[in-house]
Structures are given as C-alpha cells and as structure tokens.
Curated annotation (Swiss-Prot):
One GO BP: thiamine diphosphate biosynthetic process
Binding site for [4Fe-4S] cluster: 406, 409, 413
Catalytic activity: 5-amino-1-(5-phospho-beta-D-ribosyl)imidazole + S-adenosyl-L-methionine = 4-amino-2-methyl-5-(phosphooxymethyl)pyrimidine + CO + 5'-deoxyadenosine + formate + L-methionine + 3 H(+)
UniProt keyword list: 4Fe-4S, Iron, Iron-sulfur, Lyase, Metal-binding, S-adenosyl-L-methionine, Thiamine biosynthesis, Zinc
Protein name per its UniProtKB record: Phosphomethylpyrimidine synthase
Organism of provenance: Methanospirillum hungatei JF-1 (strain ATCC 27890 / DSM 864 / NBRC 100397 / JF-1)
Length: 426
C-alpha cells in the first residue's frame, strides 16, 4: 500500500510524523495533504533518506541538480557537487547526467547523500540509443520503461517524466514558433523522436503502465516541463499551457492510482507573469505541489543567473510555489563546479525564505536578527545567518578595532551611538 493510500485510509505513517515535526504542523495536516494530493513526501523502499515534505502550508523547498555532460565526465566532481549542495542546505538532489556510465554515476551520487534524489529516466534511454544506434530517434519504447524501473530500484525518490509532450502539444508549438527555441533537453529528445517515427510519446500513450512502475517502487511523479520557455519572450505561450493542461489531467490520474505527484512549472518568466503562472498551475492541478524551475526573469545576465533566478524564485514562492530548482552562476555558460553549486543553493534558499516570509508569515528569524544587530550581538547574528561561515569569514577578514562595531562604520556605529543615547535617556 502506498503512502497516498495510507493517508486516504486515515493512517498516519512514520514519514508523516517526521515531516509534521519538521514543519511545526499537526500530523493530520500532513496526512490530509497527502490524501488530497496537495503535499508529497518523496520516499523509496530501497533507501532511507532525510525526509522532506513539499506542498501547501509547508516551507518552500530547494532542489540542487548535478550531473555530467558529454564534455565533462568527472564522477568525483559530481559527488563533490552533491556534497556541496547538501552542505549548502538543499532539500533534494537531482542527478541529470548525460555523459559517462549512467548507472555508476547515479549510484555514487545516491550513496553520497542522505537527501531524496530525483532523476529524468528518458535522458539515459535516449542517449543510450544514440550511443548504440547513432541517434536519439532510434530509442526503443521498452528501453524507456525498463530504465525507469531500473532507476527506481537504485533508490530514486522522484522522477521528472515528460508526460505532457504529445501530438497536440507539438502542433501548438509548430503553429506558433518561438523566439528562444526549445530549451528542455527532454522536450527536444521527445520532439525529434515523435516527428521522425510519426508516433505518440510513449510516456503519454502508455501512461497507465508508467504509473504501475512508479507505484510499485513508491516513486513520486514530477510531471516534466518539456515545453517550458527558454526565453522570457516565450513565457506563458500556447505550447506551455497546452502541456500544463495535459500534465494536470495526468497528475489527477496518477494520484487516483495512489501515486504522489508534483507539477513542474516554467523556467524563463518575466516578473509580471509569475503570479499568473503560479495561480494558473495551482488552479488547474488541484493545488498539487508546484515545482518552479528558477525562474529566470531576464535573459541578459549570464554569469549572474543565480541572482536572476533568486528574484524570480522569491516571487514564485510568495505566490504559492512549493519547490524551487536552483540555478548556478554557470547557467547558460558551462557545467557548474562545486563552488558554483554551493552558491546556487544559497541564492535559492534566500529566495525561498523571502517568499515564505510572505506566504507563511515566517518572520521570527528576521525579527531575531534585528534584535541581535540592535544589541551588537555578533555571535547571535552569525548563528541566525543563512550562511554563518560566510558571515563570520567576512567579519573576521576585516575586523574593526572596536569589537562591538564593524569596519563599515567603525567609531561612528549608528547602533552603538543610539544605544548609548537611549540608555542615558532611560
């Protein structure tokens, strides 16, 4: 029996108890959320993980993606990136390799973390076809489902599966065109395969069979966003919305079968369309957990896309997004290194917190920081910081002669002066 079926029968599982304690909500709140499809807890019968709940009424979670490319296959570096992401405070990891030995890389990454791990099975299926037969268009449908099951048995907790890329979606895309092209690797692979073979997407055509695999291995379905915009000028277009409609329908079907479901959202969205996207996706999916890929809010800042994404992620979280995929400074430029992974996670965690200050009224940490600064309590400030080591490092590198002040103001520290004046008035 799946965790969804347990929840429907009124059973509060150990996982629900753990997440309720983490989030400061009742155990029945979590149970009802899972039963209704508004909360998920990615689990696996094959490995124990640090549990996290994703969905309505819970803290916004951050995903850290790692993985090789065809140009850079360094398994040790990917393991370091996993560790860097976890050290920076990521809630989940996605392993998205496209180069090297897929099974070995995924196994190493899974073994390196206590966090829930996600994957995109079609990457391996299409790339193995290209290696064996010369092109992704030769991918065999049976291999796609076989690889999905193999990845589940490795202990994968959730999978991004591009169920909404079908003939109707492609027709919308072809009629309309795009300024920024098709940026989803999974969407591009499927588009090429479908057009060459004149066949429907097997993940859509055989959706019930896919769900049987996911349910058997208790894998959370994340409905992949193959038609997401790759440029802000393409945001919220017909192809994206068509895919959302299909994914929302299939998400309902999967949940009815006892599978936990996350709905993926777009990746390049201008600020004035973020609220629209979040509300539309929440409405159409029945308030299922919403996974925003960034989003990037302007296309002109390569090298700083972690900051660009943080702007979009904060607003997304504020309006109801539940899950944020981080973006690194290397986005659109290169495969990130461990340091860039760390920075990307920190940027996204800041954004998630900023959103939760509004969405969940979570402001206690900020209030405590205000008091610590007023009181010139540096140790408390470090402990309250989202990255204590970074805050401590900067202060120590440029320490003031006055232990209470910092080198920004030195002898003329406004807080110190004001505190003395107020004390005299008292």
């Amino acid at each position: 029996m799946s965790i969804v079926e347990d929840a429907r029968k009124g059973i509060i599982t150990e996982e629900m108890k753990v997440v309720a304690a983490q989030e400061g909500v009742t155990e029945d709140f979590i149970r009802r959320g899972i039963a209704s499809g508004q909360i998920v807890i990615p689990v696996s019968p094959y490995r124990k993980v640090k549990l996290c709940g994703i969905g309505g009424g819970l803290r916004t979670k951050v995903n850290c993606s790692v993985g090789t490319s065809t140009d850079i296959v360094d398994v040790d570096m990917e393991v370091e990136k996993v560790k860097a992401g976890e050290r920076a405070g990521a809630d989940t990891i996605m392993e998205l390799s496209t180069g090297g030995d897929f099974v070995e890389i995924r196994r190493r990454c899974i073994e390196a973390t206590t966090l829930s791990v996600g994957s995109v099975p079609l990457y391996q299926a299409f790339i193995e076809a290209a290696r064996k037969d010369g092109a992704v268009i030769h991918m065999r449908e049976d291999d796609l489902f076989r690889i999905t099951e193999e990845q589940a048995k490795l202990g994968t907790n959730f999978m991004a599966i591009h169920t909404g890329v079908n003939r109707i979606t492609l027709e919308r895309l072809q009629r309309q065109g795009r300024h920024g092209g098709l940026c989803s690797r999974g969407g591009a692979f499927l588009t090429a395969w479908m057009l060459h073979n004149d066949k429907e997407n097997p993940l859509y055509a055989e959706f019930d069979y896919l769900c049987e695999i996911l349910k058997e291995h208790e894998v959370t379905l994340s409905t992949g966003n193959g038609m997401r915009a790759g440029a802000v000028h393409d945001a919220t277009d017909r192809a994206q919305i068509q895919e959302l409609i299909i994914n929302a329908e299939l998400g309902d079907r999967a949940h009815e079968m006892g599978i936990q479901v996350i709905v993926e959202g777009p990746g390049h969205v201008p600020l004035d369309q973020i609220e629209t996207n979040v509300r539309l996706m929440k409405r159409m999916s029945g308030n299922k957990p919403f996974y925003m890929l960034g989003p990037i809010v302007t296309d002109i800042a390569p090298g700083y896309d972690d900051r660009v994404s943080a702007i979009g992620a904060a607003m997304s979280s504020m309006h109801g997004a539940d899950f944020i995929c981080y973006v690194t400074p290397a986005e659109h430029l290169a495969l990130p290194n461990p340091e860039e992974v760390y920075e990307g996670v920190i940027s996204s965690r800041i954004a998630a917190h900023v959103g939760d200050m509004i969405k969940l009224n979570k402001r206690d940490q900020d209030l405590a920081m205000g008091h610590a600064r007023r009181d010139l309590d540096w140790e408390a400030q470090f402990n309250l910081a989202i990255n204590p080591a970074r805050a401590r490092q900067i202060r120590n590198e440029r320490a003031s002669a006055d232990a209470d002040a910092c080198t920004m103001c030195g002898d003329y520290c406004a807080l110190k002066i004001a505190n003395k004046v107020i004390k005299k008035l008292d």
